[in-house]
Amino acid sequence: MAKKKDTPGDGEFPGFSDTLQRTPKLEKPHYAGHRDRLKQRFRDAPDALADYELLELLLFRAIRRADTKPIAKALLNRFGSIAEVLAAPENLIAEIPGAGPTVALELKLVEAIAKRSARSTVMEREVLGSWDKVINYCTAAMAFETREQFRILFLDKKNKLIADEVQQTGTVDHTPVYPREVVKRALELSATAIILVHNHPSGDPTPSRADIDMTKQLVNAAKALNITVHDHVIIGKHGHASLRSLRLI
C-alpha cells in the first residue's frame, strides 16, 4: 500500500509564513469604487450631478484606468460649459492634459448624436407649429460654432421641413450671402418657403445693419419667385433674435 505523501507544513519551510505576513497588499487606486458610486448617483438622480461629474461619466468609456475627474474639470476650465466642451474643435480638446485624440473623438461623437437628435424633432414636421423645437435645434447646431454659418431651412407648401443646409461658412464676424444662390437652391428643392438662420460667435444675437440689409435683399429676391421668407433667426450662445419678431421683415 502506497504511503500518502505528507503536505509540507510551516515547520518544513522556516520563515515562509512570516514572509507571507510581511508581504504588503497591493492598494487599489484612489478612484476605485468611485466610478460605481458615480454611476449609481446618476441612476438615482441625474439632475443632481454637477457638470464636471457628467463629463466624468462620459469619459469612463474613453479612459478605462485613470481618474477622469481632473480631465473633466480641465475641459470645463478651458472651454466654459458642457455645450462649449462638446462644440470645441477636436484638436483643442486633444491638447488638454490626459485627454488626447480618444477623448476628443468620444466628445465629438456625443455632439454629433445630440445634433442629430435635435434635428430629428423638426424634420418632416410643420415647422411653424414646432417653433420652439426649431430654435432648440438651431441652437444645438450653431450656438457654439467659432465661425459664422449661414443656414437655410427649406419648407414645402405645408411648411414641413424638406431640407436643412449650411450654405456658407465665414469668419468670426462675417458670412458672405448671395441671394441669387439662395433662391436658386430653393427652386431646385421645390421649396415654397424658407427660414434663414445664422449664428453670431460673439454670443450676442442682436442683428447688425448688414444682417438687416441682406435680409431685405433676400426677401425681395424670393418674393419675385413666389418664395416666402418666414423669418431670419440669429443664434447667440444664450439666446436668439427673430427679425420678424423685431418687425425687421
UniProtKB/Swiss-Prot annotation:
The keyword Lipid metabolism does not apply. Residues 127-249 form the MPN domain. It comes from Brucella canis (strain ATCC 23365 / NCTC 10854 / RM-666). One of its GO terms (molecular function) is metallopeptidase activity. Keywords: Hydrolase, Metal-binding, Metalloprotease, Protease, Zinc. This is UPF0758 protein BCAN_A1306. Residues 1-34 are annotated as: Disordered. PROSITE patterns: MPN (PS50249), UPF0758 (PS01302). The lineage of its organism: Bacteria, Pseudomonadati, Pseudomonadota, Alphaproteobacteria, Hyphomicrobiales. It holds the Pfam family RadC. PANTHER family: DNA REPAIR PROTEIN RADC, UPF0758 PROTEIN YEES-RELATED. SUPFAM superfamilies: JAB1/MPN domain, RuvA domain 2-like. Belongs to the UPF0758 family. Zn(2+) binds at residues 198, 200, 211. A motif (JAMM motif) lies at residues 198-211. GO terms for biological process: proteolysis. Residues 24-34 have a biased composition (Basic and acidic residues).
